[in-house]
């Protein structure tokens, strides 16, 4: 099995708790490559809860650096820091962020993550990720932002979101996913053909 998780990376450090500066965090996917990587993943997740909890469990780059051995990291979805910077037009900042993660995890253990759930933002970001990968030599990986197993589970997932957020299904202003493409897709369905 592939064991991993998506973590929240604190805006500053995992110890900072200023509502104006630290409520926002970015996603990062961590996968255990080895037994040592699994142990490091457990340490990272444990410390995110015991040391970094502020609205949600958070990690920071010092914690990642301290426990990076045996871990593969992916830049995550649109909520990843690299993608977030690209969305606001900060290509140089995205490049620095990606190179920083490569420095933490190693040349072949950090990947830029391409996703295509049919979102307009992905259509804008993906070509920039490809460009960034070519310029930096950081490898690319095509994935899907999986929140449920099968496409037909989208409605059940929507109901669970309503329960989680104390909303009604008929509330037009509630949190919802934009479409039903957030399921576990086959390798063929995920293949990114725009390289």
Regions found by a protein language model. Give the residues of each.
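Phosphodiester-processing cores and adjacent nucleic acid-binding clamps
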Residues: 1-195
């Amino acid at each position: 099995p592939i064991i991993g998780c998506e973590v929240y990376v604190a805006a500053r450090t995992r110890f900072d708790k200023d509502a104006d500066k630290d409520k926002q965090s970015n996603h990062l996917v961590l996968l255990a490559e080895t037994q040592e990587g699994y142990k490091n993943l457990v340490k990272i997740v444990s410390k995110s809860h015991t040391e970094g909890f502020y609205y949600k469990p958070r990690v920071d780059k010092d914690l990642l650096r301290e426990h990076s051995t045996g871990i593969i990291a992916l830049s995550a979805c649109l909520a990843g820091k690299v993608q977030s910077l690209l969305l606001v037009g900060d290509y140089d900042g995205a490049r620095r962020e990606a190179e920083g993660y490569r420095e933490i995890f190693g040349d072949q253990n950090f990947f830029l993550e391409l996703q295509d759930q049919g979102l307009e933002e992905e259509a804008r970001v993906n070509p920039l990720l490809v460009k960034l990968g070519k310029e930096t030599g950081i490898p690319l990986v095509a994935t899907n932002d999986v929140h449920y197993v099968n496409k037909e589970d989208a409605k059940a997932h929507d109901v669970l979101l309503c329960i989680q957020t104390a909303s009604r299904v008929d509330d037009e202003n509630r949190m919802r996913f934009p479409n039903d493409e957030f399921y576990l897709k086959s390798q063929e369905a995920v293949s990114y053909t725009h390289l």
